[in-house]
């Protein structure tokens, strides 16, 4: 019996969208989009995250100034109920994503042993 992995992947995608954690994340994002202050801060934060990822990808360590800026962003996000709700929802969905990633990559890890 041949398994169509694309069908399985599409079924997984639908399953993720049906999760209560995914729905909570969608609702939290909609609330951010309706609030200009939260939306602006979230946009600034995601741009800052991309900047840090760029540094890391080029082998550069974040400077103390960048680390201070990250702490400042984290404090602002924790202080904003909409952003805090979104971050919490992201973490909840992230548990599923991490588990799924572990399962999917298990066969490749078996080969690498």
From Swiss-Prot:
Pfam families named in the record: Com_YlbF (PF06133)
HAMAP family: UPF0342 (MF_01526)
Family statement: Belongs to the UPF0342 family.
Name by which UniProt lists this protein: UPF0342 protein SMU_782
Natural source organism: Streptococcus mutans serotype c (strain ATCC 700610 / UA159)
């Amino acid at each position: 019996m041949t398994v169509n992995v694309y069908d399985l992947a599409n079924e997984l995608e639908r399953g993720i969208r049906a999760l209560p954690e995914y729905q909570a994340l969608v609702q939290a994002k909609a609330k951010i989009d309706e609030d200009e202050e939260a939306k602006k801060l979230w946009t600034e934060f995601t741009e800052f995250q991309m900047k840090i990822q760029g540094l890391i990808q080029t082998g550069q360590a974040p400077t103390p100034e960048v680390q201070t800026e990250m702490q400042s962003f984290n404090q602002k996000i924790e202080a904003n109920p909409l952003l805090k709700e979104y971050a919490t929802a992201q973490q909840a969905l992230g548990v599923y994503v991490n588990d799924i990633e572990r399962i999917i990559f298990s066969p490749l890890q078996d080969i690498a042993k």
